[in-house]
Every structure is written in structure tokens, then in C-alpha cells.
Amino acid sequence: MPTILVSALEASSNVHLEELRRNLPKDYRFIGVFEGKEALYSPREFSIMGFRDVIGRLGFLLKAHKEMVQLAKQADMVLLMDSSSFNIPLAKKIKKQDPHKKIMYYILPQVWAWKKWRAKSLEKYCDFLGAILPFEVGYYQKKAQYVGHPLLDEIKYYKKDIKGETLVFMPGSRKSEIAKIFPLFVKVAQILEQNEGFKRRVLVVPSFFKGLDLKALYGEDIKLFEISYDAHKSLFEAEFAFICSGTATLEAALIGTPFVLAYRAKTMDFLIARMFVNLHYIGLANIFYNALNNETPGLGESQLHPELIQHFLSVEGLLKAYEEMDRERYFKESLRLREYLASGSARKIANGMAFLLNLT
């Protein structure tokens, strides 16, 4: 029975991990950080945003890091997913502890956007790099393989036309995101009802919020919305979506649902990030759409969907995006993006894990 040390700190990584486990033999045992009863820590304990937040949780992060390195001694191999600030140093320490321990990195850091030197670190400490974007492989010498984007394995609903019955609102999965974005979405929903009459308003809530007091998280205005824990189905049924930056924006693009990206960070965090990351776009769909059109990812001229970031984010801007978006063009181009990203990611990663285990 192979034992796999997993480090999956993000909510989206755990969705991908769930699909991966469906493609693995039932006797694989998982330990580490992931959504599951047998985990050392839940990903929710790592749900922090911003530089100040990291400093405040530094003691916990160092403790978790040390425990994961020790836990690696029990594992036959290591699977790291996303979260490069935690996982690259983890890979380094595990390799130092046991140079023969096989390490796979799935959902690679965005070295094409910033910190390109991380590519060398990954190749030094990891044995298999699963790239989910076609253009990522070019940033590595030999260990990266394109495996397809995992969302195309996970999404079961794809629009055949742009029709929809509801308005979907997705203000993020972190409390800080919800606090900044949800009040704007509430005002948008109220104004649209005044202008266009009643439409079903669906608030998509992360599945890991089940059982929590949603009114405490979202406030009294949550009563204006229907609650859904199924993002894919809700997006499929929607006429339009208002979405906080993140994986959900790419999900909407692949499903074919028109949307506008909304994002606002703490001012200091935003300014610091701008010092390191120089991109025109932050939305994954726009970044990948640039690559599809043979432009530098995140720096191209082409745009699939509107983005309203920081001080550009307003109720008026969101309403304008809803009213003026060319839905026919968007739908046509979203189909091109879907074809570009391919599928079969989970199966290929499962095969890669089996290969590494055979080498141990």
C-alpha cells in the first residue's frame, strides 16, 4: 500500500486532488495537508491572504513545515500542488533529508509571470513536473510534461449556447475577499432587479463552508440570494456571472458563461505585488487567451472578458460590464480556449505517480 505525502493548501488544489484520487488505485494512502479526515492539517488552516497575514501566522507555518518534513519519512513519494511559497522550500528540505525520495509537483507556480528562477529550483528538487498549460513547458529544461488542464476533467456541464436563467455571484472563498467584494455584488443585484425586473440570484458558496453560519460570513444581505454549493452547475445555468478573481473565472470561461472579474486587495498588498508582477491581466482565462493568440501570457492585447481591479472596481463598472459585454464573441472564443487547454490531466498525473513509485 503506497503512502503519499500530499501538500495541497488551496481549495482549488483539493478539487483537482479529488479528481486525481478517482484515477488512482484504492489502496493509495494519503497523509499531509489536504481535505480529508486522515490529514495532518486542513487547507482551511492555511487560508491567509496578504503579507501582514503571513507574518501573523509565521509561527504556525514554520511548525507545519517542520512536521511535513518529518512526515515525509513515512511516505513512498511526495505530491506537491500549487502554493509555491510553502511547497518549494518543502521540496528542498525533503530532498536534503532523503535525496532518493521521489517528488512530483502538480499545478506549477506561475514562473512565466514572476520569479522565473523558481523553475530551476523545481527541476533541482523535483522528479516530475506536471504542467497544466501548454506554454509552461518552455520554461523548464527537461522534467516538465504537459498533462492538460484539470478543470476539463472535472467540469461536466458545458454550454451549447449563451442562454441562461440566473445571475450568479461568486465573491471568493476567503473571508477577506468576501468582505470586500460581496457588498458590491449585493448592490449590483439590487440595481439589476430595479432595472430589469426579478431574476434568480444565485450566490455560490465554497463547499467547505457547509455547516458554517453563512449569515455570520456574508451578513444579513445573504437572504437576497439562493445558495448553491455547486459552482459548475450554477455557472452552466447562468446568463451572466460576477466573479472574484481565482479559479472560478477559468471555470466560467470553460463552461461558456459570460462574466466579469472583480478583485480588490489591501492597498499595501496590491502595491507590493505590483512591484514583482507586471501583468496586464490577472484573470486566468485572459492570460491563457493571450497564449492561445500567440501573445505573451498576461501581457497581450487580446481580452476574453472584462477585469475590474482595485480602484477600478465599482458597482457602476460591474453594471457596465454586464450591459456591454459582447456575449456572442465571448462564447465563440471560450470554445477555442477549451480546445486549447485539452484534457486528461488526472489520468496522466496518476500514471506519472505510478512511474515514480516503480522507481523507488
Curated annotation (Swiss-Prot):
One of its GO terms (biological process) is lipid A biosynthetic process. Pathway: Bacterial outer membrane biogenesis; LPS lipid A biosynthesis. Keywords: Glycosyltransferase, Lipid A biosynthesis, Lipid biosynthesis, Lipid metabolism, Transferase. InterPro entries: Glyco_trans_19. GO terms for molecular function: lipid-A-disaccharide synthase activity; phospholipid binding. Transmembrane segments: none annotated. Pfam families: LpxB (PF02684). The keyword Lipid metabolism applies. This is Lipid-A-disaccharide synthase. It comes from Helicobacter pylori (strain Shi470). The gene is lpxB.
